[in-house]
Amino acid sequence: MKISITAPAKINLSLDALYKREDGYHEVEMVMTTIDLADRLFLERLDEDKIVLDVKAHFIPEDRRNLIYQAALLLKNRFNIKMGVRITIDKHIPVSAGLAGGSSDAAAALKGLNIIWELGLSIEELAEISSEIGSDIAFCVYGGTALATGRGEKISALPNMPGCWIVLAKPSISVSTPTIYKELQVDNVEHPNTEKMIESIKNGDLDGIFASTGNVLESVTLEKNPQVKRIKDRMLAFGAEAALMSGSGPTVFALIKQYSRAKRVYNGLRGFCEEVYMVRPWSESENDTIN
């Protein structure tokens, strides 16, 4: 059996950290949505008991360091699977960008393996299993738009993000998520209005969504990396209704109603930033296939 499955990137419309928990993680409230910038995974069931990864991108491991490999190994051990799998990954999501590319790939792998190994697991079961690998994989299992709480693994679905244009720009720098969280001072930062964001999404109110964007991690990342702030400022100067860093960065995204204005923002970032994308909220228009 062979299947292909998409793994869309995500952005944080709002990201709040409330306090540091006893387990070392922060208690978070994040409103996230998937976008139509996506990787694609091709899975082939093997008779041999082995996991083979083939990543069509540089600097991405093909061994146990890869979340896809960890997802496959977790399912094999949990359910005593004696079959193997070959997974080929066609990468489009930037690496280490704050867009959950690795987590989305792992989520897609879990869903694909559930099919080719005929496990019969529900989405809820896959999401619960995924939390053993990473905090934000559960959201990627569900996709769409949702509120994530706890350390990011507790998911409450929300209506789809209203139609708009999204321009993403990733500078050529890397950001350490653990370092950003370690330096975050939750008592000395402006917190986003998560309730207002949820209300705006439920009402399909784009202006309310634009006004409610916020990310407490900007207080650290933008201070340490002025280039990220310059990208955000440039987006707003070219007409973005809202601009925000995704996750711990370094990618910044702009939210824009009109195509012509989005194109102006996109063109204004090209040449200023190496990786620039113009996308839409995820619509699941690209179907997964099974052969």
Swiss-Prot record:
What's the gene?
ispE
Per the UniProt entry, the Enzyme Commission number(s) are 2.7.1.148
Q: Which residues bind ATP?
A: 94-104
Q: Which InterPro entries match?
A: GHMP_kinase_C_dom (IPR013750), GHMP_kinase_C_sf (IPR036554), GHMP_kinase_N_dom (IPR006204), IspE (IPR004424), Ribosomal_Su5_D2-typ_SF (IPR020568), Ribsml_uS5_D2-typ_fold_subgr (IPR014721)
Which spans are transmembrane here?
Answer: none
Would I find tRNA processing among this entry's keywords? Answer: no
Described purpose of this protein according to its UniProt entry? Catalyzes the phosphorylation of the position 2 hydroxy group of 4-diphosphocytidyl-2C-methyl-D-erythritol.
- Record's catalysed reaction(s): 4-CDP-2-C-methyl-D-erythritol + ATP = 4-CDP-2-C-methyl-D-erythritol 2-phosphate + ADP + H(+)
Q: Record's HAMAP family?
A: IspE (MF_00061)
Provide a GO biological process annotation.
Answer: isopentenyl diphosphate biosynthetic process, methylerythritol 4-phosphate pathway
Q: Which residues form the signal peptide?
A: none
Family from the record: Belongs to the GHMP kinase family. IspE subfamily.
Q: Which organism is it from?
A: Listeria innocua serovar 6a (strain ATCC BAA-680 / CLIP 11262)
- Highest taxon of source: Bacteria
Name by which UniProt lists this protein: 4-diphosphocytidyl-2-C-methyl-D-erythritol kinase
Mind listing the UniProt keywords for this protein, alphabetically? ATP-binding, Isoprene biosynthesis, Kinase, Nucleotide-binding, Transferase
